[in-house]
């Protein structure tokens, strides 16, 4: 379904999926998010319509590929909305675009040089979202390294 489209890197999707569900296809959150990428049913319905695929609540937790395709498409739309600024898109994936708009207004906007990105992340009002953004960015770099399949040179850690 996603072939031929410019999509986010494998590393960021792995990082989000790890943080959302630890790769559990049957994951259900207390808030109602479902599947590996923890999609809310409203969001999943909207994205399925945008992708021109049939929405299936059951498939959110029974078909990992379906869930990942919807989640990837949604995250890609957030990346496009935020001009490829990962902290904004990641925060929006977790807390919603409305909250990111609020935080950019209240805390300053790093894309307009009003504050740097690290401080912007630290000022995210919700501890869960603040930690989420930090963990996803960390995980993304771990997966980037893992997927490059370059051997770890341990001596650099001991100099």
Question: What spans do the regions from the language model cover?
Answer:
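Catalytic glycan-binding domains that act on GlcNAc-containing polysaccharides
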Residues: 1-159
């Amino acid at each position: 379904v996603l072939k031929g489209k410019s999509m986010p890197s494998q590393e960021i999707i792995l990082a989000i999926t790890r943080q959302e569900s630890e790769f559990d296809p049957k994951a259900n959150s207390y808030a109602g998010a479902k599947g590996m990428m923890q999609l809310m049913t409203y969001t999943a319905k909207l994205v399925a319509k945008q992708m021109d695929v049939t929405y299936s609540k059951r498939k959110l937790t029974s078909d990992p590929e379906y869930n990942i395709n919807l989640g990837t498409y949604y995250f890609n739309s957030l990346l496009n909305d935020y001009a490829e600024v990962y902290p904004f898109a990641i925060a929006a994936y977790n807390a919603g675009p409305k909250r990111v708009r609020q935080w950019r207004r209240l805390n300053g906007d790093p894309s307009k040089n009003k504050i740097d990105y690290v401080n912007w992340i630290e000022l995210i009002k919700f501890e869960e979202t603040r930690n989420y953004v930090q963990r996803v960015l960390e995980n993304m770099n771990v997966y980037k390294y893992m997927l490059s399949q370059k051997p770890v040179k341990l001596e650099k850690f001991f100099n």
